[in-house]
Amino acid sequence: MRRITLLMALCLPLLCFAQKERVATDKANYDPKLWTKRLYNLQWIPGTETYMYYKDGNIAIFDPKGEEVGGINIAKLSQTYELKSYPDIVYVDGSQVVVETPDHFYIYDYLIERPMFEIALPEKAENRAYNHAQRAVAYTMDNNLFLATEAEPRFPIAVSKNENIISGQAIHRNEFGIQEGIFWSPKGNYIAFYEKDVTHVGDYPLVDINTTPATLKNIKYPMAGTHNEIARVGVFDLKERKTSYLRIDNRDAHYLTNLAWSPDENQLLLAEVKRSQDHYDLNSYDRASGQKIQTLWQESNPKWVEPENAAIFLPNKPQEFIWMSEKDGFMNLYLCDASSAKSRQLTSFKWVVQEVLGFDAKGENVFIGGTGEDPRERHIYSVNIRKGTVKKLTTKEGAHDAYLSDNGRYFLDVHSALNTPYNVSLFDIQANTSKTLYEAENPLANYQLGKVELLTLKADDGTPLYAKMVKPSDFDPEKKYPVLVYVYGGPHDQLVINQWNGATYPWMLALAENEQYLVFTLDNRGSENRGFAFESVIHRNLATYAMKDQMTGVEYLKSLPYVDSNRLAIYGWSFGGFLTSSLMYRHPGTFTTAIAGGAVIDWKYYEAMYGERYMDTPEENPEGYQDNLVTRYIKNLQGNILYIHGYIDPIVLPQHMLAISQAAIDEGKVIHSFLYPNQEHNVRGAESIHLTKIIVDFLLKNNKAATND
């Protein structure tokens, strides 16, 4: 009996390992078993020191000690409004919450468990913005802007019969941090809104194949160097029920960005960026007259300027505000005065401030999120506004996101790191203590998946380059492994992050395990969160430094004894598709296989706002556009390349894929392509599983010994 027990003990680890499940590579991204369990609808209750989240199907409310002090009966709420799924709950006032459905805003008092009032909306209402002080919703429909109240669901704020006049929507194709087009004033007495005239913007035809015959849908698309939209800012007075406009001369079609209200509702601040994007002015305007008051801040840079964050006013000094700028090379904070137009630098970090979270009750300290010394991480800091002293509040390595309480006493710290799943702590800023509220279990513990490692390489000038590699769980350094290099490499993205699994797609973890692959990713110069000098090397020539750094990564791979240098493949999407194509053609023979999704092929076909920032116009920079023209290099193709594109992509237009196809014909080269007829720039829904299958199948079929076809 003892011998049997001993034998079982010896075999137990093997049995446990054998019990681990494999995950289908193409389904890994969408397998809920692999998702980390989170605290859903986590938020502070305004004006209190209590917070809430979904627990056991209901909303639970907690005090700072972590004790449950109340909640919302979701079954009762759902019954009241005939809800078919868990609603997103937003607290607005005391015990009142807002429940949003496709055609209503409901205000519900959870203490007495009954509805207070409701606002009906048309089915086509979009861009909806609720204001509790006015018990009203501003929304857009058919390019026009309306106001809905209990009594009146469709009061016109800005309505035009001209379909080229669009009100209440984000402008400038969501560049400059613009995510919305409706801005309630602090007390709810006014609504500011963006309006754009796209009359002179070129039409681009997209085809809907779901009709018989197929029908044409034109979109407005301002290609680099062509006519741009003309924007302006409107102001609606709720009491007078009248709309007026700021007096901005915008005949030069410059960009209107980062709109903000002053606390007294008398001024609006607006960052106005030249079309050339090498200069901007932060101007204040009088709300009543629409006249410009003064310029509060100016910034110029021969490469580009890119304001992305609106002014944030101090709670105790309504004339002062925080402005974020990278004029010194890194995104830092500046304290500005809206009356005197004076400013001073508040922080001088040699790292990137990513977000202003809020202030303490006295307005003496501002809380921020930023990379800190390691750009792969994100930490929370407090900055004393008068003294400039800085205190780092989070200490665990990894990525921290914070939800600050209204009084600035506490924040909910949402954290993960490479080997640490999602967890939430309550941080008491005053006491400098942290209490763990929730730790998610490792959702991958029972599955056979690859493991992620973080790496540091050096560019040709000594600049650190951060990378990551996924290896099979049974990695054997004596074996030879094929490699998939996954790239993005462009502005406003970072792929190598010290958060759970290195922010790696689950299908790549499954690929490493199931197919005995290595998956390698490197953030080259040009990617974000490293400061302006690191990012701006791409100016006027997007591919040069990106390719240099990616080839540094390739040389590193080739130096590893366990890498099969004859079986390197590369994959990227959007800018990553451009970089994938550039590397495949301009470094022929390096990769046997390439997969380029939603790829930019010719930058003169790309949108003006983004393209002109980094490349100037085709007229100003003909050499740069020619050097970065992917079709120019297709004659060098060795191996196999697959292009994937959404047929109704409104961002990287289908014209790019057609251009590379024609170039292949002209050069007598064979490329592979796949269109998703009903998808836009990113393939979504059930078809994304098909996308992963397409990628993996092409990779496995073609990433063999290099050929010279």
Kindly give the residue locations of the regions a language model identified.
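Disordered, low-complexity tails and leader-like regions
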Residues: 1-3, 60, 489
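Bacterial Sec-dependent N-terminal signal peptides
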Residues: 1-23, 708-709
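Residue-level detector of secondary-structure boundary/capping sites
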Residues: 3, 136, 179-182, 224, ...
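Hydrophobic alpha-helical segments, especially transmembrane helices
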Residues: 3-4, 52, 682
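Beta-propeller folds
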Residues: 16-392, 397-401, 409-410, 420, ...
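Serine-hydrolase catalytic core recognition
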Residues: 203, 265, 401-709
